[in-house]
């Protein structure tokens, strides 16, 4: 089963509740109608049923406005993320040069340049760009094959927030 079928079978009235939203570009211009924001995920390319002249991806979802922002592959990239509920088995491991983070099960491990705690949670600055970092995903920290920490992604960081 695909994700849409699963939702339709398990969430009563989902089509009626969330139909009629719009795909928008990065400036907010309407590009066409979508089938309801719950049916899309950040980074999704297949099943959009809209043509923009080159491959388009879901870059952001606004459930309050029932909009799905579309963009291109480079717009999915970020060099950091903000986490909530971040915990480590030993805080001294947070500064290990061997520390990596994964944002998907069996996903690419990204080297961690630095971690910055503030009143909003934890900023994770990466050594390289990650794609399709989305709120709600888990970020799991490893040293080798050992899980040493984790947290929940609140948002990707913008370029001006990438400061160690």
Show the residue positions of the predicted features.
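Nucleotide-activated chemistry modules centered on ATP-dependent adenylation/adenylyltransferase
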Residues: 1-147, 151-164
